[in-house]
Swiss-Prot record:
Source organism of the structure: Cereibacter sphaeroides (strain ATCC 17029 / ATH 2.4.9) (Rhodobacter sphaeroides)
Similarity comment: Belongs to the EPSP synthase family.
Record GO biological process: amino acid biosynthetic process; aromatic amino acid family biosynthetic process; chorismate biosynthetic process
Record's protein name: 3-phosphoshikimate 1-carboxyvinyltransferase
InterPro entries per UniProt: Enolpyruvate_Tfrase_dom, Enolpyruvate_Tfrase_sf, EPSP_synthase, EPSP_synthase_CS, RNA3'P_cycl/enolpyr_Trfase_a/b
Residues engaged in binding phosphoenolpyruvate: K28, G101, R129, Q176, R357, R400
The protein's Enzyme Commission number: 2.5.1.19
Record field: catalytic activity: 3-phosphoshikimate + phosphoenolpyruvate = 5-O-(1-carboxyvinyl)-3-phosphoshikimate + phosphate
Length: 445
C-alpha cells in the first residue's frame, strides 16, 4: 500500500532577481492520457517529453499491470505497446496510484467496461478523496464498485461484462469524471454521450480523436455535448507532450513578484481550457509576452517571456475556475504581493483536491501576515504589495501547496518554511534545481 516517507522541510528566502531559461517538465494531464490511450491502441505508441513525476510513473505501472508493454528509452522518451480496446488483462496485484487523483480515475474508466476485476489504492491523501463522482457514472455502464465508506479507496471495481452505452450529465466541472466516462465508453457498443454544463480541459477529446476515435463536440442548450462512438480500433501515435502550464505557473509567478526578474519559459501549452491563470495575471498587470506561438501534437504552445511587474488586485469570475482549478494556490500568493484585493469565486472544488486547498492557503497566508477572507466557495486575498513571511506552512501532502509557499518565501521579507517538500516530486521533480538555477534561495531544512 502506498505510504509516505519522513517529512522533508524546505525553506525559501528572499531572492535576488530570477534570470535565465526555465525548462518545464511535460504536461501531467497529457502524459497520463498518452500512456492510457497508448495501452488501448493496437501497436506501438512513441511518447517524447513525458512527465516523469511519480503520478505519471504510477499510471505507467498500472498500464503494465493491465497487460500493456510500457518501456522507458531515455529521459522523457517512452514507448507503449498497446493491447487494443477491450484487450486489458486482469491485474495480478493491487493497482497503487500513489497521490494521483487523475491517474486512479482515468484508469478506473479505462478498465470499467472490460470483464475483469481490479483493486485500487493510493497514499493517505488519495485515500481521503471522493471516488463516487467517478464510480456513479461507471455504474451506468454496468460496472460494480466496492470501496470504503463515502466511496473512498481502497476500492475494487468489477468491470461490466456486457456494457451498455451511457448518456451522462457531469454534475460538477471535472475533466477527470468526463474523461473516465469517455474512456469507459471506448469499450461499450453504440454511442456514449457526456454533457458538460461548464467546459473543462479538453485533452481527452483532442487525444481520442488523434488516436482515431470517432468523437464529436457540439454546444446545445444543456451545455457542451460530447458524443463518442464505442469499440473503435485505436491507432498508435507519436505523441510530443507539451510543457505543463500548471508547473510553468510556479517560475512564472516567482518572476513576477521577485524584483528585477526576467525569465524565458519555452514550449508551454496554451490550451484555452487551461489558460485561466495567464488571463488573470495579464488582467493584474503582469508583463508576460507569448513568443513563437505554434502547434505541437494538436496543442497550441508558446514561449513565455516574463518580467517582474507591479500588480493590482482583480476579481476572478467563477466561470474561469475550470480553466485554472490547479492554479488558485499560486494565484493567491501573487495576489498577496499585489496592491488591493483579489476575489476568487467559484472555487469550492479546491476543497476536495489533494488537500482542502482553500483552507491550506488561507492558514499559511495568514501565518505569513496576509489578510484573508473565505467561505465555502470564495477566497479573498487582501494584497498590500509586500508580505512579512517568517512562518512555517503546512502542506498537507499537497505538491501545489508546497511549491506555492516556497515561491512566497522567495519574495517575502522573512524566510518561509514548508513542513514537507517531498510531495513536489509527484508533479515537478526538478522544481528545486530549476528554481535555484534561476537564482532562487531555496534549501532543504
Amino acid at each position: 500500500m502506498s505510504g509516505h516517507g519522513p517529512a522533508q522541510p524546505m525553506t525559501a528566502r528572499r531572492s535576488g532577481p530570477l534570470k535565465g531559461r526555465a525548462e518545464i517538465p511535460g504536461d501531467k494531464s497529457i502524459s497520463h492520457r498518452a500512456l492510457i490511450l497508448g495501452a488501448m491502441a493496437v501497436g506501438e505508441t512513441q511518447i517524447t517529453g513525458l512527465l516523469e513525476g511519480q503520478d505519471v510513473l504510477d499510471t505507467a505501472k498500472a498500464m503494465r499491470a493491465f497487460g500493456a508493454e510500457v518501456i522507458q528509452h531515455g529521459p522523457g522518451a517512452w514507448s507503449v505497446h498497446g493491447v487494443g480496446v477491450g484487450g486489458f488483462a486482469e491485474p495480478a496485484e493491487v493497482i497503487d496510484c500513489g497521490n494521483s487523483g487523475t491517474g486512479v480515475r482515468l484508469v478506473m474508466g479505462a478498465m470499467a467496461t472490460s470483464p475483469l476485476t481490479a483493486t485500487f489504492t493510493g497514499d493517505a491523501s488519495l485515500r481521503k478523496r471522493p471516488m463516487g463522482r467517478v464510480t456513479d457514472p461507471l455504474a451506468l455502464f454496468g460496472t460494480r464498485a466496492y470501496g470504503r465508506k463515502g466511496g473512498r479507496l481502497p476500492m475494487t471495481l468489477v468491470g461490466a461484462a456486457d456494457p451498455v452505452p451511457v448518456r451522462y450529465t457531469v454534475p460538477m466541472p471535472s475533466a477527470q469524471v468526463k474523461s473516465a466516462v469517455l474512456l469507459a465508453g471506448l469499450n461499450a457498443p453504440g454511442q456514449t454521450v457526456v454533457i458538460e454544463r461548464e467546459a473543462t480541459r479538453d485533452h481527452s477529446e483532442r487525444m481520442l480523436r488523434g488516436f482515431g476515435a470517432e468523437l464529436s463536440v457540439e454546444t446545445g442548450p444543456e451545455g457542451q455535448i460530447i458524443t463518442l462512438t464505442g469499440q473503435p480500433e485505436l491507432r498508435p501515435q507519436t505523441v510530443a507532450v507539451p510543457r505543463d502550464p500548471s508547473s510553468a505557473a510556479f517560475p512564472v509567478c516567482a518572476a513576477l513578484i521577485v524584483e528585477g526578474s526576467e525569465i524565458l519559459v519555452p514550449g508551454v501549452s496554451r490550451n484555452p481550457t487551461r489558460d485561466g491563470l495567464y488571463v488573470t495575471l495579464l488582467e493584474m498587470g503582469a508583463d508576460i509576452a507569448f513568443e513563437n506561438e505554434r502547434e505541437e501534437g494538436g496543442e497550441p504552445v508558446a514561449d513565455l517571456r516574463v518580467r517582474a511587474s507591479a500588480l493590482k488586485g482583480v476579481e476572478v469570475p467563477p466561470e474561469r475556475a475550470p480553466s485554472m482549478i490547479d492554479e488558485y494556490p499560486i494565484l493567491s500568493v501573487v495576489a498577496a504581493f499585489a496592491e488591493g484585493s483579489t476575489i476568487m469565486r467559484g472555487v469550492k472544488e479546491l476543497r476536495v483536491k489533494e488537500s482542502d486547498r482553500i483552507d491550506a492557503m488561507a492558514r499559511g497566508l495568514e501565518a505569513c501576515g496576509v489578510r484573508i477572507e473565505e467561505d465555502e466557495d470564495t477566497l479573498i486575498v487582501h494584497g498590500m504589495g509586500r508580505v512579512p513571511g517568517g512562518a512555517t506552512c503546512a502542506t498537507h501532502l499537497d505538491h501545489r501547496i508546497a511549491m506555492s509557499f516556497l515561491v512566497l518565501g522567495m519574495a517575502a521579507e522573512a524566510p518561509v518554511t514548508v513542513d514537507d517538500g517531498s510531495p513536489i516530486a509527484t508533479s515537478f521533480p526538478a522544481f528545486t534545481d530549476l528554481m535555484t538555477g534561476l537564482g532562487a534561495d531555496l534549501a532543504a531544512g
